[in-house]
Design a protein with these regions (language model features):
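Short glycine-aspartate micro-motif
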Residues: 2-6, 58-60, 125-129
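Short, ordered coil/turn segments that flank beta-strands lining enzyme active or ligand-binding pockets
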Residues: 19, 70, 142
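Single conserved hydrophobic/aromatic residue that forms the stacking wall/gate
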Residues: 136, 141-144
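Glycine-rich phosphate-binding loop and adjoining helix at the ATP-binding site
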Residues: 32, 39-43, 47, 57-59, ...
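Conserved beta-strand and immediately adjacent loop positions that scaffold enzyme active sites
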Residues: 1, 13, 63, 126, ...
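Short glycine-rich anion-binding loops that position phosphate/pyrophosphate groups of nucleotides
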Residues: 64-67, 131-133
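Short glycine-rich, Thr/Ser-proximal phosphate-binding strand/loop in the N-terminal lobe
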Residues: 2-40, 74
Length: 144
């Protein structure tokens, strides 16, 4: 069994998968806007799930942005500004007291689709995650 955690701008979602990849548990909570509260929330989720399943579980965390190989700091996480320039993976490892694997959320999405999703029968899989918004500012419809 293993824990997967998806950290986003507004939520933290956790899932526990069994050895065959079947979902055993799924939970969602609001994402705090404070960096240390997020680390604490992930620790609480981890401990709660380990207690529920009565064993230590490996954990992987996906989030916007990437870890700089030179510094270990997160960069390019515009929707999760609280992650910018923070040693997220190292802080999680220290707080949880075990190995924590962190990866960019788009990379995790593409890997999941390639391994057991819609791309599992293909040699090459291209994953796209787009957060987008269209703004109409001149003249504003609200000004009408």
């Amino acid at each position: 069994m293993q824990i997967g955690i998806d950290v986003g701008a507004t939520k933290i979602e956790s899932v526990v998968l069994d050895e065959k990849g079947n979902e055993s548990n799924r939970e969602r909570t609001d994402c705090p806007k404070d960096y240390f509260q997020i680390v604490k929330t992930i620790k609480e989720i981890d401990k709660k799930l380990e207690k529920k399943f009565n064993k230590e579980l490996p954990i992987g965390v996906c989030h916007p942005g990437v870890h700089s190989p030179q510094t270990g700091l997160v960069k390019n996480a515009p929707n999760c500004y609280w992650l910018e320039k923070k040693p997220f993976q190292n802080d999680l490892r220290k707080e949880l007291g075990k190995e924590v694997f962190c990866e960019n959320d788009a990379n995790c999405f593409a890997l999941s689709e390639a391994l057991d999703g819609s791309g599992k029968h293909y040699k090459i899989v291209y994953g796209i995650i787009i957060g987008s918004c269209l703004l109409y500012t001149s003249p504003s419809p609200r000004d009408s």
